[in-house]
Amino acid sequence: MKFCASLFLAGASAAVAFAPSAYVPSKMGVARSSQAVASGSTALSMAADGDAFDQEKFIAESKEMRLKYLEEQAMFSLKISCENYGDAVFPNAMIAGDVVITHLLHRLGYLKDGKAKIMVVDTFHLFPETMEFLREIEDFYGFKAEVFCAEGVPVGDKAAYDNKYGANLWKEDIEQYDKVCKVEPFQRGLKTLNTNCMINGRTRWQGFERAWIDQFENAPIGGGLAKCNPLAYWTLEDTFDYIAKYQVPHHPLHAKGYPSHGDAKDTIPIPSTDPRNPDPQEGECKFENWEVKGDKTFWFDYASERKGR
């Protein structure tokens, strides 16, 4: 689908209304530092003659400026997608970027009015905390996710899955497991929901084929889905900065040393470097109380594509 210039101009004007500086906090998310940005600009603290340069303050203000515009960009791309496509769907794995998108969709009102549907694939091998967390954010934001799982198995019925496909399928044939538990339910979910625009959390920092993605991709000629990549220009640090700024509900495994998560069978936390603490689930690097504790560089590097998963 192609949009005329007037549509984009209208969307751009509307996006300003949703700028973080104009955001009214609700119980769904509390902006802790939006006051740092006023009237669309931030005054940087430059050192006067004889005064010491406050580097930490400068960095904090610079990060706030960056995050402000990243938010505006992300909300603009979501608004264009949800307002111009009747069936925008967000496949949500509840990783850090996904909870940010969930919060942005809430701020725009698209979870409440149904202009964006949330889709979740339950592989039956997720961490127990993952589906529990889904129930929490459904209650928190007031939406109901569309959950899909292996074909021919009732949602949430692990015993039925084991009986039909075998509890050890992933050990015996990992390619078949991926097809049965991930690929087929994902594709079926998009088709069932009549998806014409897929919202996702892909970002350039993940590299490889994602290194040059833009915030929006038109549907391929001949068929396919349009894609909205609201976090295309975000780093993982930006993502956690946003979670901290608005106190966004996030996966409990972050507090146990997991920068990212997938199936429990093949996701590990950051290993502890303390010989007195051999348990990797008690590593000293984690996200807790709205901040990264431990080696921040290690945390963000370990969460990169194909690491720790």
Segments from the language model and where they lie:
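Intrinsically disordered, low-complexity segments used for protein-protein interactions
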Residues: 20, 25-26, 44-46, 271, ...
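Nucleotide-activated chemistry modules centered on ATP-dependent adenylation/adenylyltransferase
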Residues: 48-309
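N-terminal chloroplast transit peptides
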Residues: 1-31
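Proteolytic processing junctions in secreted/extracellular precursors
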Residues: 17, 38, 43-48
